[in-house]
């Protein structure tokens, strides 16, 4: 066997449809485009969103809202996640580095601690932001809350 004798497996290739090569081929004459009209001509391409002259949906519906350029996006971390980290790693202080090491957040994200779940251990938590309920829950069990500066 050599490279010059290799052929594709039978049935794996398909011959392309040759249009406009006589009536006997089944694709002659109009070349599968039907008779006359804009869509039968060469170079035809319909404008995106064109609905045949009807007012298109993007013009019928009103404009609304906007994206704030000053939006600060946080990665939410619940207290239940903090508690599971304390249980598995026996930590007294939990910072952003610990969350990154555990694979919970990526290094370049801002972190906000939310009050989902319960926390039972005394712990010092460092993050960029805290919800009011999360902060109260951490302080209630005797822990401390440290806010770091936003990067």
UniProtKB/Swiss-Prot annotation:
Signal peptide: none annotated. Binds to the 23S rRNA. PROSITE patterns: RIBOSOMAL_L15. Residues 1-45 are annotated as: Disordered. Belongs to the universal ribosomal protein uL15 family. Part of the 50S ribosomal subunit. This is Large ribosomal subunit protein uL15. Residues 21-31 have a biased composition (Gly residues). GO terms for molecular function: rRNA binding; structural constituent of ribosome. NCBIfam families: rplO_bact. HAMAP family: Ribosomal_uL15. Keywords: Ribonucleoprotein, Ribosomal protein, RNA-binding, rRNA-binding. One of its GO terms (cellular component) is cytosolic large ribosomal subunit. It comes from Azobacteroides pseudotrichonymphae genomovar. CFP2. One of its GO terms (biological process) is translation. The keyword Ribosomal protein applies.
């Amino acid at each position: 066997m050599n490279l010059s004798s290799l052929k594709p497996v039978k049935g794996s290739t398909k011959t392309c449809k040759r249009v406009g090569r006589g009536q006997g081929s089944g694709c002659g004459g109009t070349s599968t485009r039907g008779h006359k009209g804009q869509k039968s001509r060469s170079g035809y391409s319909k404008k995106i969103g064109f609905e045949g002259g009807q007012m298109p949906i993007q013009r019928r519906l009103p404009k609304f809202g906007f994206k704030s350029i000053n939006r600060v996006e946080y990665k939410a971390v619940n207290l239940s996640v903090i508690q599971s980290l304390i249980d598995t790693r026996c930590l007294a202080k939990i910072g952003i580095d610990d969350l990154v090491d555990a694979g919970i957040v990526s290094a370049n994200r801002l972190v906000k601690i939310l009050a989902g779940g319960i926390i039972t251990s005394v712990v010092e938590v460092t993050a960029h932001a805290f919800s009011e309920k999360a902060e109260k829950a951490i302080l209630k069990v005797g822990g401390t809350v440290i806010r770091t500066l936003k990067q």
